[in-house]
Curated annotation (Swiss-Prot):
Pfam families: Glucokinase. This is Glucokinase. ATP binds at residues 8-13. Its EC number is 2.7.1.2. Keywords: ATP-binding, Cytoplasm, Glycolysis, Kinase, Nucleotide-binding, Transferase. GO terms for cellular component: cytosol. Its main location: cytoplasm. One of its GO terms (biological process) is glycolytic process. It catalyses: D-glucose + ATP = D-glucose 6-phosphate + ADP + H(+). It comes from Pectobacterium atrosepticum (strain SCRI 1043 / ATCC BAA-672). Belongs to the bacterial glucokinase family. It comes from the Bacteria. It is found in: Cytoplasm.
Amino acid sequence: MTHFVLVGDVGGTNTRLALCDAMTGELSQIETYSGLDFPSLEGAIRDYLDSRQVTVQDACIAIACPITGDWVAMTNHTWAFSIAEMKASLGLRHFEVINDFTAVSMAVPVMGRESLLQFGGGEPVPGKPVAVYGAGTGLGVAHLVHVANQWVSLPGEGGHVDFAANSDEEDNILTILRQSLGHVSAERLLSGQGLVNIYRAIVLSDDRTPEALEPKDITERAVNNTDVDCRRALSLFCVIMGRFGGNLALNLGTFGGVYIAGGIVPRFLEFFKASGFRAAFEDKGRFKGYMQDIPVYLITHEQPGLMGAGAYLRQVLGSAL
């Protein structure tokens, strides 16, 4: 009889829930809920299980906020809960709550090559550290290391490190953003709002008034080559993505690969392919040669968070990934 576990991927807007085969990791009965439809995460979970008349003993939920103890309070949603209390209320044997990029990183060891698109470098070295990052509403970051026959995710808040300008143009952007933001983190440039920040800073640097554009407006104008400021902004976004990914690679020597997740890059994939991303990734001065063999992949799988939550829980339950 198939042993199903519950997995979830909770963002600021939507919550995705699914059943996962504890032996194979196969996902089934994926459903997306609006976060506005339920007063609590537990309410969404109960609705999912009750509508299917299914009982589970084990669950893993990936959630877009720091997980530092028993109390979880989402930064971009009103939901908040005690892990221990929800575990008891749902009658679960195992209830794992992990950061969303912990889940994405845990998907890497079980993800097929058909779900990856490579941007330069050689082949990944088995067992070597991995870096995962992705721009969306914010900038998520995690590393993954292989220790004692298990994969261990190293989550953190790497998107909030200082933005490191490395050209005259980037210096100008940093100066302008600092005037309005104070501390300028990498996320202030590598996110949906970050793309808007780059565009505005480019226009302001020429003493002009920027338009009130959304990220999708900037992307469309850049891809269609109808606005030089938008094209400059998106080009610089790609370069900064490369620089930031290169920094992650240097931190742990990620010869297992650097993996890009998040919803932004797939929206302008052809533009990204032709951009200065890879050159910026390798642009580490004396360590350029070190960088050249490190592969970078774009994750194209539709549900890496659910896949990774399943992989994390399966490993907790004793399976080898």
